[in-house]
Amino acid sequence: MSNRKYFGTDGIRGRVGNAPITPDFVLKLGWAAGKVLARHGSRKIIIGKDTRISGYMLESALEAGLAAAGLSASFTGPMPTPAVAYLTRTFRAEAGIVISASHNPFYDNGIKFFSIDGTKLPDDVEEAIEAEMEKEITCVDSAELGKASRIVDAAGRYIEFCKGTFPNELSLNGLKVVVDCANGATYHIAPNVLRELGATVIAIGCEPNGVNINEEVGATDVRALQARVLVEKADLGIALDGDGDRVIMVDHEGNKVDGDQIMYIIAREGLRQGQLRGGAVGTLMSNMGLELALKQLGIPFARAKVGDRYVLEKLQEKGWRIGAENSGHVILLDKTTTGDGIVAGLQVLAAMVRNHMSLHDLCSGMKMFPQILVNVRYTAGSGDPLENDAVKAVTADVEATLGNRGRVLLRKSGTEPLIRVMVEGEDEAQVTAFAHRIADAVKAV
């Protein structure tokens, strides 16, 4: 990564009211982005958002900045991140902008850009936008100012797109599904997609009020979904996150099915159908069980850095079509250009229906290794914990003990001041102790 001032691994993100998520900054960001994007000739930008209360304020600021640079904005209203990527492609817009902090609490928000082809903006374009941010805002001539409009039935367009990724010859008739929309951007989309494909749907997390997004619901907290699946005696549960780019599932017994297992099911089904091209891409956090299960099927596996943009880069580098993070970002390049929770969930449902198998049974070919993750908050500017000699020594000792039957990974979060300590191995008690031992060393820095 280059030394960029504002853009992180997933756009610009922070606490609302604190720099950079302030009205004046976002107005200037809209202007700077408009100046850079206008060089490519198009004058149209798609703007979508999740259900955070701050989205109203930030979309107004963005639109004002874009208009000053001479670009027009088309609003989608609350819409999943992958829907904005899709609409950007279908409208041939110069870019799409999503106002969301994904799985974070309501008091955070962020700005993320898509290019004309529905993929994340290249680094050099983000750098050009940052360079424009250092200049004084100017305004185009009045006759050249941008306009604002709303996209008619944006939700309906995306619902039809999602349904189109599900095989025409299959139906969800007879399946009882609980879907948890995290009080986020999929609340008016996912239940309708599933119902229209024939499922009996129980929807939770579908009452957004601006401040309850991701609050004890959604892909980052599946406890409510697990409980509801058991109470309803449902066939499965589907949990999406606040902006709909992640999916975590729950089987009929209430067991959590994460992004690694979801990718395993989709990759294996692709192999069975003769549609798998190449291998599958995971990340440094992907479970060793996934790697071993894919190897047994003869499916090549590669690891990318953590972050869906790096999974996508690795897919493009290898010419493969399927990648995922264990957090639930699943990228299926034969269907879409970015992580799409609804579309990924539909492919798992298709495998269930086609094979007459439960979600639990579809997961049975993959044995998950115990993987313990401990997050340690650190103070920026107090030295790099990853370069500390004591931390390095403890880590090396743990790695030597695990040998080739486990892994240790220490990395910084791309969005928060956290060190993520991950230890993986065959014995859960052992890896838990090792993870906390390393975490204690990090805390002592």
UniProtKB/Swiss-Prot annotation:
Cofactor note: Binds 1 Mg(2+) ion per subunit.
Record-linked CDD domains: GlmM (cd05802)
SUPFAM superfamilies documented for this protein: Phosphoglucomutase, C-terminal domain, Phosphoglucomutase, first 3 domains
A Pfam family the protein falls into: PGM_PMM_II
Modification sites for Phosphoserine: S102
InterPro entries assigned to the protein according to its UniProt record, in alphabetical order: A-D-PHexomutase_a/b/a-I, A-D-PHexomutase_a/b/a-I/II/III, A-D-PHexomutase_a/b/a-II, A-D-PHexomutase_a/b/a-III, A-D-PHexomutase_C, A-D-PHexomutase_C_sf, A-D-PHexomutase_CS, Alpha-D-phosphohexomutase_SF
Keywords, alphabetical: Isomerase, Magnesium, Metal-binding, Phosphoprotein
GO molecular function, one term: phosphoglucosamine mutase activity
Cofactor(s) essential for the protein: Mg(2+)
Reaction catalysis annotation: alpha-D-glucosamine 1-phosphate = D-glucosamine 6-phosphate
One BP term from GO: carbohydrate metabolic process
List of catalytic residues: S102 (phosphoserine intermediate)
Entry PTM: Activated by phosphorylation.
Function (record text): Catalyzes the conversion of glucosamine-6-phosphate to glucosamine-1-phosphate.
Family statement drawn from the similarity comment of this UniProt entry: Belongs to the phosphohexose mutase family.
Protein's name in the database: Phosphoglucosamine mutase
Gene: glmM
